[in-house]
Regions:
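A juxtamembrane structural motif centered on a specific transmembrane helix
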Residues: 1-10, 14, 376-464
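Hydrophobic transmembrane helix bundles of membrane-integrated enzymes that assemble
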Residues: 7-33, 51-69, 74-254, 304-386
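Juxtamembrane/transmembrane-helix boundary motifs at the membrane-water interface
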Residues: 33-51, 296-305
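Hydrophobic, Leu/Ile/Phe/Ala-enriched alpha-helical segments that form helix-helix packing faces
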Residues: 34, 277-281, 377
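Membrane-interface helix termini and inter-helical loops of multi-pass transporters
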Residues: 37-45, 141-151, 261
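Long extracytoplasmic/lumenal interhelical loops at the membrane interface
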Residues: 259-319
Length: 464
């Protein structure tokens, strides 16, 4: 009885912990989405006040999560070390991004990926819808920008920048594809294709359009059965290639090289800026704030010190050697773990996509966009990757083939129930038993048979 009570208490605590985590993610996404719009206030609160309120609510949810999340002492110490490291990197770099990402990973035990995707889908879809409606209604300003290489103005459609519209639309579509993962058909690709058209022709945001095209293609391909076998290996190979290429171009970019120059132009000077900040400032262990770097005027007239739009280069120069090393190791280890467990679900597919997109954006370290980073929590707490997407596990179980079986006589059952018991007694396997112990009058004089799994046999045999 006590074990049953403990089991119920543990399950209830896990569900309560999941609920407060999802609530924290909702407030975090809501704040990020609102900050990308052109709204001056939300429910009477100015944007800085609204941001502070959301941050406090997220922290409060994490404080509650501590009460429900169970782990061993050693795992707790490791989690505490990661949080402390993120705080040190924040103080050194002046960027809180690393703290939020680490907190969501550390408190991500027992969390599932599809509820996170559902929250992201609702938040970003509604944000796009309301911002566009308010823009055409004149409630918010339609800010226009000029791209140096293009003719005409770029509309922001109620956002603070055209690229912000593209990012919100991208994240809404990626969340939708994550929810549909395993069942994505051609009809499901209509909305992503329409979104790509809106990104290109309405706001001229090419990076988000290309990212959504890549994400939709990979999600559609990697949802099929072969992905369970090949997905982890393919993802591991691509991840290593992307990380190595990022650091190679950061260190060895040469504008005189035709390949380098062409790729740099296609990526809007991303290779140049990564190399510029890598060679211009020394690498640090915990990060650097680049306060002494010259201000760069971006397209939206915002002046910033650091312009590096590659996840791995950005992590290295902004948050230091240790954080960059841990990020790369975690990416490799999680796909090795997936290969070992024979698991490839929506969380791992999304993480693989974000690793690829990290070559040209810093989205891969922003948890509001890359909530697939919650997969790293399985490394921290040694939990199976399959629990990130239980619905996929149940679906695979329903589709699993019947395991062939063989039968042998069980003398102990014969001695117990006598020769009057009927035909076969099946223990295990996928078939239902035709009788139960103690029934009489079926095939009198025949020995009961017990079914045992034997994967070496391709047919079913019966001994009576």
């Amino acid at each position: 009885m006590s074990s049953l009570v403990d089991s119920v208490a543990e399950t209830t605590g896990m569900r309560a912990g999941q609920a407060v985590y999802y609530l924290a993610f909702f407030f975090f996404c809501l704040n990020e989405a609102v900050c990308r719009t052109a709204f001056d206030n939300v429910l009477g609160l100015d944007i800085p006040t609204f941001t502070s309120l959301c941050n406090y609510l997220v922290i409060a949810c994490f404080a509650l999560k501590i009460l429900f999340q169970r782990s061993t002492f050693s795992r707790g110490i490791l989690a505490l070390f990661l949080v402390a490291l993120s705080v040190v990197c924040w103080r050194a770099s002046g960027n809180t991004l690393v703290v939020w990402t680490v907190l969501f990973i550390v408190f991500g035990k027992d969390v599932e990926i599809r509820p996170l995707a559902a929250i992201a889908f609702v938040v970003y879809s509604l944000t796009v819808f309301l911002a566009v409606i308010c823009c055409f209604s004149g409630i918010v300003e339609d800010i226009t920008y000029l791209r140096g290489s293009s003719v005409g103005a770029r509309s922001s459609l109620g956002f603070n920048h055209p690229n912000s519209f593209g990012k919100c639309l991208l994240e809404a579509n990626l969340a939708y594809l994550t929810l549909r993962f395993g069942k994505i058909n051609m009809y499901d690709l209509i909305v992503p294709l329409l979104s790509i058209g809106a990104m290109i022709f309405l706001v001229d945001t090419r990076t988000s359009a290309f990212a959504l095209l890549v994400a939709a293609f990979l999600m559609f391909i990697l949802q099929h059965s072969f992905a369970k076998r090949m997905g982890p290996s393919i993802s591991l190979g691509i991840s290593v290639a992307i990380i190595v290429a990022s650091y190679y171009f950061m260190a060895a970019y040469n504008p005189g090289n035709t390949l380098h120059a062409t790729l740099n132009e296609a990526l809007s000077n991303r290779l140049y800026y990564a190399n510029y900040f890598f060679t211009g400032w020394p690498l640090t262990l915990f990060g650097y704030d680049f306060a002494d770097a010259p201000l760069h005027l971006r397209e939206n007239q915002a002046a910033i010190h650091l312009i590096v739009d590659n996840t791995y280069s950005f992590t290295l120069v902004q948050f230091g050697l240790l954080t960059a090393f841990l990020l790369c190791v975690a990416v490799v280890l999680v796909f090795l773990k997936a290969k070992k467990e024979g698991c490839f679900n929506a969380a791992l597919c999304g993480l693989a996509i974000m690793v690829v997109l990290g070559f040209s954006e810093t989205w891969s370290v922003r948890f509001d966009a890359n909530y697939f980073l919650v997969a790293f929590s399985t490394l921290l707490y040694s939990t199976p990757l399959s629990q990130l997407d239980p619905s996929a596990t149940r679906s695979n179980a329903n589709l699993s083939p019947i395991i062939p079986t063989t039968q042998v006589r069980d003398e102990s059952l014969f001695n117990r129930f006598g020769p009057s018991y009927g035909k076969e007694i099946r223990l295990g396997g996928a078939w239902k038993p035709r009788g139960q112990f103690g029934l009489r009058g079926i095939g009198a004089g025949r020995l009961p048979a017990v079914q045992h799994r034997d994967v070496s046999l391709g047919t079913k045999s019966f001994r009576r």
